[in-house]
UniProtKB/Swiss-Prot annotation:
Name of the protein in question: Capsid protein alpha
EC number in record: 3.4.23.44
Site (Cleavage): 355-356
Record-linked Pfam families: Peptidase_A6 (PF01829)
Positions contributing to Ca(2+) 4 binding: 216
InterPro entries: Peptidase_A6 (IPR000696), Viral_coat (IPR029053)
Entry keyword Calcium: yes
Positions annotated to bind Ca(2+) 5: 244, 246
Any one GO molecular-function label of the UniProt entry: metal ion binding
Active site per the UniProt annotation: 67
Organism per entry: Nodamura virus (strain Mag115) (NoV)
Amino acid sequence: MVSKAARRRRAAPRQQQRQQSNRASNQPRRRRARRTRRQQRMAATNNMLKMSAPGLDFLKCAFASPDFSTDPGKGIPDKFQGLVLPKKHCLTQSITFTPGKQTMLLVAPIPGIACLKAEANVGASFSGVPLASVEFPGFDQLFGTSATDTAANVTAFRYASMAAGVYPTSNLMQFAGSIQVYKIPLKQVLNSYSQTVATVPPTNLAQNTIAIDGLEALDALPNNNYSGSFIEGCYSQSVCNEPEFEFHPIMEGYASVPPANVTNAQASMFTNLTFSGARYTGLGDMDAIAILVTTPTGAVNTAVLKVWACVEYRPNPNSTLYEFARESPANDEYALAAYRKIARDIPIAVACKDNATFWERVRSILKSGLNFASTIPGPVGVAATGIKGIIETIGSLWV
């Protein structure tokens, strides 16, 4: 009989051979894994280097907040060729919400207009409640002071992005209520209506007027929304969702929509837009951001409203702004692909405390989805501290 110890001694060389064979077979696998990781890093670096400086500036303007001192970039790097005037609009304003009311802040892609504001009783409809404009600083310098010279300096526009944030400043013992955010697709249309002329017999004439479709959504809360306590605040972005960045003309002669001599019923509009001290300038190709703040009776809700927009204008040659125009940047497919990827994947909105998480998500989209490294600063200081792993190669571009 062969003892167990003897059998173990005889089997030991065979076990050692198998272990050595396994180690030898694993070595190529490890080398392949290292080679794959090395190739991925090289691809990330190559793609980053392939992206042009104007492309990086475009993403910086589109997705960096106004808290950072950045220029508006050199324009949208698509196939358009011509002189453009990139502009980064910024608004920072304190706001107090009326107790017992629900306040609608509609951030729409209207050049020079930060948002439209309306108030209604809690639970009531916004139908027929005028949306009053809140202008960006410098509106008159860009669009003139009268409705007849709105297009004297710039004749056309297209949006790269816009964003808005409500940052509560209320006392923690006095606030109450909720904040809800969702997107509304608005469209400028030309509607017809019949007008009776006092002749004998009376004559009916067909008239045309511009109108904004989609405002009925002010009374709707879609499933795809952000809802939270007022004290949590919100931050949201909207980008161009059309296949191309199309230019739209600057509208002239409209102090309201519909015009003053046309009723909402005639224009088939849910409610009207008023522009006290400003004018209606047109409507771009991106969803409006609807921010609904509900303030119960007795609550004290105050906040800082921040709105920003990256817009590209076509300057008028007879304007003094023409000398500041520049050639539109060359087509950059890497930057445009990054823009579209982020547009698909960013959430409707986030709470103020989650700003860092929001921007970490944007950064991960750029790294994993497109295999190039970048870093994007956040909308508030807390967001900037949440970003890790800044790539030194392009870090200076995002400071």
